[in-house]
Curated annotation (Swiss-Prot):
Residues 142-168 have a biased composition (Acidic residues). GO terms for biological process: cellular response to heat. Induction: By heat shock. This is 32 kDa heat shock protein. Pfam families: NPL (PF17800). Keywords: Stress response. Residues 210-273 have a biased composition (Low complexity).
Amino acid sequence: MMQFFGTIVTKEEPVNLELDEGDIFHLTKAIIHPKSQGKGKVYLTAVISLMEEDEMEEDDVDDEEESPREDIVEIPIGILEAGKIDQIDLNLHYNFGQIVRFELQAENGAGYVVALSGSVITMEQGGCDDEDCDDEHCINHEDDEEIDSDEEFGDSDQDEEDSDDEEIPQLIAPATKKGKITEISEVPESKKEKTPEPKKVPEPKKEQVKQPTQPQQKKAAAQQPEKANNKPAAASPAKPQNNQSKNAPKQPQQQQQSPAKNNNNKRPQNQNENNKKKQKN
C-alpha cells in the first residue's frame, strides 16, 4: 500500500524519518517553500545510521536508554539556490532498517525553508498489501509473483506423479484390404497431354528479279557498243610537237646553208662583162 508523505525542513529544525517494520520511504522531490527567506546556496543532506540487529529485536527498550551509534554517514543529496534552483527531482528509497535525518547546511542558511515530498510503501508480513502494486522495491514482492505463477501453471510434484500413472490408450490403425496391383503398360492417347504445336511464322517474301526477254536482250546488246564509244578515250602519252621536233635539228643546217643561199641569190654576170674584163687584162 502506498501513501503520500510530505514534510518541511529548516536549518533550525531537521526532520527524523521514522518508519515501521516493513515500510519503505520513496523521496521524489525537494522544493524551496514560498515562505523561505534564505539567500545563497543551501545543501540538503541525509544523515543515515544503520540500525543494529539487537536494536531491531528489542522493540520494548525504553527511549531514555540510547546507545552510541558509530556507523553514521552524511550524504548531500541536492543543492538549492533561491532564484536559480528552486526545486530538484529525486529518486531515493529508505527502508525501516535505516535511521535517516534530513538537514540543511549552508553558511547563510538562516531563513531557508525546504519542502520534501514522496510516498511511503507499507508492508504486512513481509509481503505487499496492495494487489495492484507495481513497485520493484517492495519486499518479497517478486517471491509472491513466483508463487502465483507456480499455482497458475500447476507445477507441483503431485501433478507429475498423477500424469505418470495415467495410461495412454494405444491407437491401432484399421486393417486395409489387400488388392491386386495392375501395371499400366501404355497410356491411352486420349489421356496423353497434348503439347501445343508452335505456330509457324510466315517467312517474308523475297523479291523476284524478272529475267529480260529476248527482244530486250537484243536492245541491250545494241546499246553496249554505243556506250563503249561514248566512253572517253584513255589518256595517251603526250607526243612531242611536230614543229618543235622538226625545227630543233634543222636549225644548224639552215645556218650552214645560209652562205650557199647567198651565193645562189647573186645574179649571174653577163658574158659580155666577162669578156670586157679579159680584154682589159
